[in-house]
Amino acid sequence: MMKVLVVVALLVTLISYSSSEGIDDLEADELLSLMANEQTRAKACTPRFYDCSHDRHSCCRSELFKDVCTCFYPEGGDNEVCTCQQPKHLKYMEKAAGKAKKFGGKIKKWFG
């Protein structure tokens, strides 16, 4: 078991080292130009409950998570309908994160 942990730690170290070298090789100008290209490539996202059948990866983000394009067949219909929706488990996680953030603010007031 100890050998497995040592091998895993070694692999993680090697991967992080190799990825940091790749970033260091980029010059600042190249990095800025890459970021500028990424911003111009971005397109408008599809709001929640709107049709996303044209591009299933275009759904907007909520506070923490990206909405998912969900497709279904309405009752008695033959046409597939796709809309951007937030899965319930992510909705509950966002609510919990909001409550934790609010509670953290109260604790900060009490002891801050």
Swiss-Prot record:
Propeptide feature ranges: 21-41
InterPro entries: Spider_toxin_CSTX_knottin, Spider_toxin_CSTX_Knottin_CS
Extent of the signal sequence: 1-20
Main location: secreted
Pfam families named in the record: Toxin_35 (PF10530)
GO molecular function terms listed in the Swiss-Prot or TrEMBL record: toxin activity
RNA-binding as UniProt keyword: no
Disulfide bonds: 45-60, 52-69, 59-84, 71-82
Subcellular localization: Secreted
Ranges annotated as spanning the membrane: none
A GO term from the CC aspect: extracellular region
Record's keyword terms, sorted: Disulfide bond, Knottin, Secreted, Signal, Toxin
Tissue occurrence: Expressed by the venom gland.
Superkingdom of source: Eukaryota
Entry domain remark: The presence of a 'disulfide through disulfide knot' structurally defines this protein as a knottin.
Family the entry assigns: Belongs to the neurotoxin 19 (CSTX) family. 01 subfamily.
Protein name: Toxin-like structure LSTX-D10
The organism of origin for this protein: Lycosa singoriensis (Wolf spider)
